[in-house]
Amino acid sequence: MSGVWRAVACCRGCAVIFHSPMGCVHVAETMDLGSHYRILADGRQENMECVPLVSSNIREKDSIFGGTGRLRQSISYVMETYHPECLFIATSCVAGVIGDDAESESADAEMRYGIPVICIPYAGFLGGEYSEGYYKTAETIIERFFRPCEHVPNRILLLGDQMGPEGQYVTEVKRLLSLLGLEVQGQFPGYLPFPEWANAPAAELAIVLGTTGQSDRMNGMADLLEKKFGIHAVKDIYPIGWENTCKWILEIGRLHGNVEKAKVIIEEEKKRIDSYVKSILHITKGKKAVIGIGRGTHWYNPSDTISALRQLEMRIEAVILYDNLTDKEKAEYRHRIGKEESIPVYDGRDGQELIDAADILLTTNEIVSTKTKQFFIPMVPMVGTNGEIMIFRALYRLLCRYGNKGGIAYATI
């Protein structure tokens, strides 16, 4: 259900009903709160309001007699109170177990109120994980509301979330695109107002905001847009790490027919990075670094971290694979790291002495059993030139701290 909510959370003109007990709404609220604090930590402000989210508040007796009456009342309440232009209904595990026919209620409400009322009947976790609801909602919007229209030159549609329009990922992507003379029309799903859905296919290019663990479903969404509306997509290349940022800029330049300008931009951005690295190299050069990994292979690629440390001329003493990883994940990491020349790889406790002796530990998990300075490897990666510089700055500041007292630092603006 929370995936359905995130897919339209800031789409002005929409409203969402969870056909669920009241507690289910708390999950969505917690997700929004975490995103809010991350944006505040980066010194940014949220400029978009969330759409109304209402629970039908299924009670214990409704699990016996059915909860469609509660859903009908909730629809009436939302229509009279918020006057949405489009209403989404997400069903919970409880509604799925009861067998409430939320789809029929949605169809009746659409006829009664004269607006689109769309049910995403995934029955909470019975229908799959968070991403299932998110992608199904997005695909439903594309199929029902997007309309063929003439492409507007230089207009870009961003696909994905990555902390929203005010997050570091999107702001840096917009900055790099502006250097190529490209303008972002909007971000879908989750942030494009309902009245703008029909004209979304006017974009010349769609850019997937991806990470190491990018779901095939997001790329599938890009394929759907290309098949139905002829929107070319940039996917499978993401501006994470300097090498990938260069490839990403070149690919966009190629699709936009301006490769030479893309090359000039890369040269200028490289000068920025080189200038910053030169200013901190007297602190970072020769320092001993250890990388600690406890995040699954689907969500993290150590090559970007290794590349950053090499740019700072730090000594990579070892990679430690934490005990929470499966044997399969450890084997995959050993294979990936094996491509990076001769970096030793150790299991959990076998690497404790190396961690304690290092100047800095770059880690996916906070470690309490060491006084070595720790840097938290972001779950939502820092991207582009600014992202690289932010990582470098965080490592530099951490190395400048007096003494070794443990604790962990984060990359922020």
Please annotate each region the language model reported.
Residues M1-I413:
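An N-terminal assembly and electron-transfer interface module characteristic of large anaerobic redox
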